[in-house]
Amino acid sequence: MKAFYGILIIFILISMIHLSQQVFINATCTLTSQCRPKCLEAIGRPNSKCINRKCKCYP
């Protein structure tokens, strides 16, 4: 059972590090497809979402 909790803590820490790599750029949007070219230009990858009318880029 101790191993399970250890693995769970490691998983949570890795998830937190991964989520902290998200980048909000100062670009307005209404659809996620509008963010793709902007994120490609900003960080070099088209992985993105439109959240609260702001583009969020993922590495």
Swiss-Prot record:
InterPro entries referenced in this protein's UniProt entry, alphabetically: Scorpion_toxin-like_sf (IPR036574), Scorpion_toxinS_K_inh (IPR001947)
Residues marked Aromatic residue of the functional dyad (site): 58
Alphabetized UniProt keyword annotations: Disulfide bond, Ion channel impairing toxin, Neurotoxin, Potassium channel impairing toxin, Secreted, Signal, Toxin, Voltage-gated potassium channel impairing toxin
Entries under SUPFAM superfamilies matching the protein: Scorpion toxin-like
Subcellular locations according to the entry: Secreted
Tissue-level expression: Expressed by the venom gland.
Predominant location: secreted
Listed GO CC annotations: extracellular region
Disulfide bond annotation, renumbered to this chain: 29-50, 35-55, 39-57
The protein's name: Putative potassium channel toxin Ts24
Taxonomic lineage from the root: Eukaryota, Metazoa, Ecdysozoa, Arthropoda, Chelicerata
Species this chain originates from: Tityus serrulatus (Brazilian scorpion)
TM region positions: none
Swiss-Prot/TrEMBL site (Basic residue of the functional dyad) positions: 49
Entry annotated with the keyword tRNA processing: no
Any Pfam family hit: Toxin_2
